[in-house]
Amino acid sequence: MSQQENKKMINVGVIGAGGRMGRMLIEAIQDNPQTALNAAIERQGSSLVGADAGEVAAIGRLEVQIVDDLKAVINDIDVLIDFSLPAATEQNMQVCAKHNVAMVIGTTGFNEQQEQVLAKASEQVAIVYAGNYSTGVNLSLKLLGMAAKAFGTDADVEIIEAHHKHKIDAPSGTAYMMAEAVAEARGQNLKEVVVYGREGQTGAREAGTIGIHAIRGGEIIGDHTVMFIADGEVVEITHRARARMTFAAGAVRAATWIVQQPVGQYNMQDVLGLNDYI
């Protein structure tokens, strides 16, 4: 590769490089002609520290050594991709904001304080924050908004999500995104109308509420179905993920996009240009 071509490469760092998603991200970065892996980070105490990131991802040696300190490599990257845990991502946002490094965040389960850290960081650097990076899911969000506007509160809305038995949070970030899309289209505050599962003597279903139900089992990558249940008809919008590479490739696509954007917080629909449509 010529020196001129090399200047065009986007240097990417990956948090959780040895995890399932991290390994997929490394492969996706190498598959994308615009990006190069330049930093791979694992938690302190990980047995993978010191290993070659490419060998860990089973794609061949990349000469990128896994480290346990983001600060040690922060100046080597243009953008950081973080699919980890809320507490870790909170710290990483502060480091990136201090060093003017863009971020792509796929971590879910933030509390209010961590959301405030995200908002503050996005005042200093450009950040893509999404619960799901697949094109199909983000297209589904647009369709959900259309359906919610058409039905209004005349239809009862129930969301059912299913994931593998290893997932540690529920409901999924994608389920929240779908519920938020419906609530926003209906002019509702999601926190005021959401119902998480049902048990016991719940009484009659309250009109306008949005139900969310979580299933965990096996190795399901991610299934989401939103039901609009009206008198005399039911409309279902379903997305099923069949390969994690879908999410990884989408996150890398977001990384190539965010480095060209001004400071601010964006979502995957911004990346895909879907916000240009009704």
Swiss-Prot record:
(S)-2,3,4,5-tetrahydrodipicolinate binds at H164, G173, T174. It is found in: Cytoplasm. It is an enzyme of class 1 (oxidoreductase). NADP(+) binds at R43. Its EC number is 1.17.1.8. Keywords: Amino-acid biosynthesis, Cytoplasm, Diaminopimelate biosynthesis, Lysine biosynthesis, NAD, NADP, Oxidoreductase. Gene3D superfamilies: Dihydrodipicolinate Reductase, domain 2 (3.30.360.10), NAD(P)-binding Rossmann-like Domain (3.40.50.720). The keyword Hydrolase does not apply. Pfam families: DapB_C, DapB_N. The active site is at H163 (proton donor/acceptor), K167 (proton donor). One of its GO terms (cellular component) is cytosol. NAD(+) binds at G16, A17, G18, G19, R20, M21, E42, G106, T107, T108, A130, G131, N132, Y133. Pathway: Amino-acid biosynthesis; L-lysine biosynthesis via DAP pathway; (S)-tetrahydrodipicolinate from L-aspartate: step 4/4. It catalyses: (S)-2,3,4,5-tetrahydrodipicolinate + NAD(+) + H2O = (2S,4S)-4-hydroxy-2,3,4,5-tetrahydrodipicolinate + NADH + H(+); (S)-2,3,4,5-tetrahydrodipicolinate + NADP(+) + H2O = (2S,4S)-4-hydroxy-2,3,4,5-tetrahydrodipicolinate + NADPH + H(+). GO terms for biological process: diaminopimelate biosynthetic process; lysine biosynthetic process via diaminopimelate. PROSITE patterns: DAPB (PS01298). GO terms for molecular function: 4-hydroxy-tetrahydrodipicolinate reductase; NAD binding; NADP binding; oxidoreductase activity, acting on CH or CH2 groups, NAD or NADP as acceptor. Catalyzes the conversion of 4-hydroxy-tetrahydrodipicolinate (HTPA) to tetrahydrodipicolinate. PANTHER family: 4-HYDROXY-TETRAHYDRODIPICOLINATE REDUCTASE 1, CHLOROPLASTIC-RELATED, DIHYDRODIPICOLINATE REDUCTASE. Belongs to the DapB family. This is 4-hydroxy-tetrahydrodipicolinate reductase. It comes from Psychrobacter arcticus (strain DSM 17307 / VKM B-2377 / 273-4). The lineage of its organism: Bacteria, Pseudomonadati, Pseudomonadota, Gammaproteobacteria, Moraxellales.
